[in-house]
């Protein structure tokens, strides 16, 4: 069950992302500081600060200390705006699937840039992020903003055909569920979502707020000159990634396996001679 900090975190995130009024629950000064820290960790402090401005008439928002408000306004970590990096697909590690992806992108790139193509890129990039690290909130927010474009902007029939070609349906279902659970979407607003994966989405969300887990950034290996064996830089991170990859092998088996071995190989390149 989500804590009051987590509930307010996503309420303010939605308020900042869509300029929508939300009802905020009371927080102690310590819990407001914790929410502030979480916004920094996940790169969404600017969006949540905007949400605070949108909800400034809410009684409990008015109880945020002036000191924290001043600190927040001065230490905003600006959420990265969509640019060439975020509008290009990260690519898939499975060679067969990646060739299919690049063929779709190349075909669409020869035409006028379309929101449908950009949404596919967002789905792929969010998928890669989830396979490697878990939920990436800035990427998920970009996807949410695309979904909130005026009706008819996105060709969901074409998008669905691409999702099927890339075997992305289970991951598309998961991303749709995250948009429904965390960002206030109705299922009807996410036409490519065929199944609600609430259990998996809940587990991912819990990991989002568990800052003690390792990540692939820490999953490197070192080797001393007088040793035969290599050691992991962070064994907790390694075991987390093994378990994380195993969980998603059922949702995207053709990509999860190759992604795991690519991450493993990348970690070995960090061996210190």
Question: Can you say where each PLM-predicted feature lies in the sequence?
Answer:
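Conserved NTP-donor binding/palm subdomain of two-metal-ion nucleotidyltransferases/polymerases, i.e.
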Residues: 1-273
């Amino acid at each position: 069950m989500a804590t009051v900090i987590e509930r307010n975190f996503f309420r303010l995130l939605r308020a900042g992302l869509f300029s929508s009024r939300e009802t905020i629950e009371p927080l102690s000064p310590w819990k407001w500081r914790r929410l502030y820290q979480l916004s920094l960790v996940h790169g969404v402090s600017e969006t949540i600060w905007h949400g605070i401005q949108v909800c400034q008439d809410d009684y409990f928002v008015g109880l945020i200390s002036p000191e924290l408000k001043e600190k927040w306004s001065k230490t905003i970590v600006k959420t990265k705006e969509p640019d060439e990096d975020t509008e290009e697909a990260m690519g898939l590690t499975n060679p067969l699937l990646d060739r299919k992806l690049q063929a779709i992108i190349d075909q669409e790139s020869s035409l006028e840039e379309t929101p449908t193509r950009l949404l596919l890129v967002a789905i792929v990039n969010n998928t890669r992020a989830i396979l490697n690290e878990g939920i990436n909130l800035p990427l998920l927010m970009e996807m949410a903003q695309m979904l909130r474009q005026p009706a008819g902007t996105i060709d969901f029939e074409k998008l669905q055909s691409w999702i099927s070609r890339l075997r992305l349906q289970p991951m598309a279902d998961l991303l749709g569920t995250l948009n429904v659970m965390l960002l206030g979407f109705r299922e009807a607003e996410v036409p490519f979502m065929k199944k609600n994966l609430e259990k998996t989405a809940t587990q991912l969300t819990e990991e989002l707020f568990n800052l003690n887990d390792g990540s692939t950034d820490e999953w490197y290996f070192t080797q001393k000159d007088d040793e035969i064996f290599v050691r992991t830089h962070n064994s907790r991170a390694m075991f987390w990634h093994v378990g994380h990859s195993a969980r998603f092998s059922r949702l995207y088996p053709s990509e999860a396996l190759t992604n795991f071995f690519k991450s493993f190989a990348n970690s070995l390149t960090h061996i210190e001679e």
